[in-house]
Protein backbone atom coordinates (compact mmCIF):
# COMPACT_ATOMS: atom_id res chain seq x y z
CA UNK A 1 0.00 0.00 0.00
CA UNK A 2 0.83 3.67 0.06
CA UNK A 3 3.46 4.65 2.64
CA UNK A 4 1.94 6.39 5.65
CA UNK A 5 3.60 8.27 8.48
CA UNK A 6 2.26 8.03 12.01
CA UNK A 7 3.14 10.83 14.44
CA UNK A 8 3.98 9.52 17.92
CA UNK A 9 2.16 6.26 17.16
CA UNK A 10 -1.16 8.10 17.48
CA UNK A 11 -2.08 10.27 14.47
CA UNK A 12 -1.65 9.84 10.73
CA UNK A 13 0.79 12.40 9.34
CA UNK A 14 -1.29 14.41 6.87
CA UNK A 15 -0.27 14.00 3.22
CA UNK A 16 1.76 15.55 1.69
CA UNK A 17 4.03 15.22 4.71
CA UNK A 18 6.61 17.87 3.66
CA UNK A 19 3.79 20.44 3.77
CA UNK A 20 2.69 19.38 7.26
CA UNK A 21 5.89 19.31 9.30
CA UNK A 22 4.07 21.27 12.01
CA UNK A 23 2.35 18.04 13.11
CA UNK A 24 5.75 16.67 14.10
CA UNK A 25 7.33 19.83 15.51
CA UNK A 26 4.29 20.42 17.74
CA UNK A 27 4.86 17.00 19.35
CA UNK A 28 8.59 17.69 19.74
CA UNK A 29 7.82 20.93 21.60
CA UNK A 30 5.88 19.12 24.33
CA UNK A 31 7.52 18.64 27.72
CA UNK A 32 8.87 15.16 28.46
CA UNK A 33 8.52 13.87 32.01
CA UNK A 34 10.67 10.85 31.26
CA UNK A 35 14.45 10.95 30.92
CA UNK A 36 16.43 8.24 29.12
CA UNK A 37 20.06 7.27 28.78
CA UNK A 38 21.61 4.48 26.72
CA UNK A 39 25.14 3.27 27.37
CA UNK A 40 26.75 0.42 25.49
CA UNK A 41 29.96 -1.42 24.81
CA UNK A 42 31.04 -3.96 22.23
CA UNK A 43 33.28 -6.99 22.71
CA UNK A 44 33.68 -8.73 19.35
CA UNK A 45 30.08 -9.22 18.23
CA UNK A 46 28.67 -9.11 21.76
CA UNK A 47 26.85 -5.87 22.50
CA UNK A 48 26.15 -4.91 26.13
CA UNK A 49 23.52 -2.24 26.71
CA UNK A 50 22.46 -0.38 29.83
CA UNK A 51 19.19 1.57 29.58
CA UNK A 52 18.19 4.03 32.31
CA UNK A 53 14.76 5.61 32.73
CA UNK A 54 14.24 8.59 35.08
CA UNK A 55 10.61 9.35 35.88
CA UNK A 56 9.44 12.89 36.58
CA UNK A 57 5.71 12.31 36.99
CA UNK A 58 3.41 9.88 38.81
CA UNK A 59 2.43 7.41 36.11
CA UNK A 60 0.38 4.29 36.87
CA UNK A 61 2.31 2.03 34.50
CA UNK A 62 5.16 2.44 32.04
CA UNK A 63 6.72 0.25 29.37
CA UNK A 64 10.28 0.31 28.04
CA UNK A 65 11.07 -0.83 24.50
CA UNK A 66 14.63 -1.29 23.22
CA UNK A 67 15.37 -1.87 19.54
CA UNK A 68 18.46 -2.61 17.48
CA UNK A 69 18.35 -0.76 14.16
CA UNK A 70 20.72 -0.55 11.20
CA UNK A 71 21.39 2.22 8.69
CA UNK A 72 22.74 2.20 5.13
CA UNK A 73 21.12 -1.00 3.88
CA UNK A 74 21.03 -0.83 0.08
CA UNK A 75 18.18 -2.59 -1.71
CA UNK A 76 15.69 -1.82 -4.46
CA UNK A 77 12.57 -0.02 -3.20
CA UNK A 78 9.10 0.07 -4.73
CA UNK A 79 7.90 3.65 -5.21
CA UNK A 80 4.18 4.46 -5.11
CA UNK A 81 4.59 8.25 -5.11
CA UNK A 82 5.60 11.08 -7.39
CA UNK A 83 8.75 11.54 -5.29
CA UNK A 84 12.12 10.55 -6.77
CA UNK A 85 10.85 11.39 -10.24
CA UNK A 86 7.91 9.00 -9.92
CA UNK A 87 9.89 5.94 -11.06
CA UNK A 88 8.26 2.67 -9.99
CA UNK A 89 11.42 1.05 -8.58
CA UNK A 90 14.20 2.97 -6.87
CA UNK A 91 17.36 1.01 -7.64
CA UNK A 92 19.98 0.68 -4.89
CA UNK A 93 17.91 2.74 -2.47
CA UNK A 94 19.64 3.43 0.87
CA UNK A 95 17.42 2.41 3.81
CA UNK A 96 17.89 3.90 7.27
CA UNK A 97 16.54 2.93 10.69
CA UNK A 98 15.75 -0.65 9.69
CA UNK A 99 14.54 -2.68 12.67
CA UNK A 100 16.88 -5.64 13.17
CA UNK A 101 15.84 -6.86 16.61
CA UNK A 102 13.57 -5.96 19.49
CA UNK A 103 15.28 -6.70 22.80
CA UNK A 104 11.94 -6.32 24.58
CA UNK A 105 8.38 -7.08 23.60
CA UNK A 106 7.81 -5.02 20.44
CA UNK A 107 5.41 -2.77 22.41
CA UNK A 108 7.71 -2.67 25.44
CA UNK A 109 8.15 -4.52 28.72
CA UNK A 110 6.28 -3.19 31.73
CA UNK A 111 8.44 -1.54 34.38
CA UNK A 112 8.05 -3.04 37.85
CA UNK A 113 5.49 -1.11 39.94
CA UNK A 114 8.13 -0.17 42.53
CA UNK A 115 10.05 1.66 39.77
CA UNK A 116 7.10 3.75 38.54
CA UNK A 117 6.54 7.09 40.24
CA UNK A 118 7.91 10.60 40.52
CA UNK A 119 11.71 10.77 40.84
CA UNK A 120 12.18 7.02 40.44
CA UNK A 121 15.04 5.53 38.42
CA UNK A 122 14.77 2.26 36.51
CA UNK A 123 17.78 0.52 35.00
CA UNK A 124 17.97 -2.58 32.83
CA UNK A 125 20.82 -4.39 31.10
CA UNK A 126 20.62 -6.20 27.77
CA UNK A 127 23.02 -8.32 25.74
CA UNK A 128 22.79 -8.89 22.02
CA UNK A 129 24.96 -10.94 19.68
CA UNK A 130 25.30 -8.98 16.43
CA UNK A 131 25.04 -11.34 13.45
CA UNK A 132 28.17 -11.35 11.25
CA UNK A 133 26.19 -10.10 8.21
CA UNK A 134 25.35 -6.82 10.00
CA UNK A 135 27.67 -3.83 9.72
CA UNK A 136 28.50 -2.93 13.33
CA UNK A 137 29.39 0.65 12.40
CA UNK A 138 25.81 1.15 11.12
CA UNK A 139 24.08 -0.29 14.20
CA UNK A 140 22.19 1.97 16.60
CA UNK A 141 20.16 1.38 19.73
CA UNK A 142 16.79 3.04 20.25
CA UNK A 143 14.93 3.06 23.56
CA UNK A 144 11.52 4.54 24.24
CA UNK A 145 8.99 4.66 27.05
CA UNK A 146 5.22 4.47 26.71
CA UNK A 147 2.42 4.63 29.27
CA UNK A 148 0.93 1.21 29.85
CA UNK A 149 -2.46 2.50 28.71
CA UNK A 150 -1.50 3.55 25.16
CA UNK A 151 1.14 3.24 22.45
CA UNK A 152 2.04 6.95 22.54
CA UNK A 153 5.75 7.56 23.14
CA UNK A 154 6.55 9.64 26.23
CA UNK A 155 10.23 9.95 25.29
CA UNK A 156 12.71 8.30 22.94
CA UNK A 157 16.50 8.23 22.71
CA UNK A 158 18.94 6.77 20.22
CA UNK A 159 22.62 5.94 20.53
CA UNK A 160 25.45 4.52 18.50
CA UNK A 161 27.45 1.61 19.84
CA UNK A 162 29.88 2.86 22.46
CA UNK A 163 27.98 6.05 23.28
CA UNK A 164 27.92 7.10 26.93
CA UNK A 165 24.84 9.19 27.73
CA UNK A 166 23.54 10.95 30.79
CA UNK A 167 19.84 11.31 31.46
CA UNK A 168 18.29 14.38 29.87
CA UNK A 169 15.06 15.48 31.46
CA UNK A 170 13.21 18.82 31.20
Positions of the model-derived regions?
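Short, conserved sequence motifs used for protein processing/export or organelle targeting and
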Residues: 1-170
Amino acid sequence: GFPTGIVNREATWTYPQPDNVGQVTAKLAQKAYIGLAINSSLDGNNLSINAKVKIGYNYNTLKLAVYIIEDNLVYDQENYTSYYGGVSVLKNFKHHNVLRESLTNILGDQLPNENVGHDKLFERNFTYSIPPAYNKSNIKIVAFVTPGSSKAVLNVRGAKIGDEQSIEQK
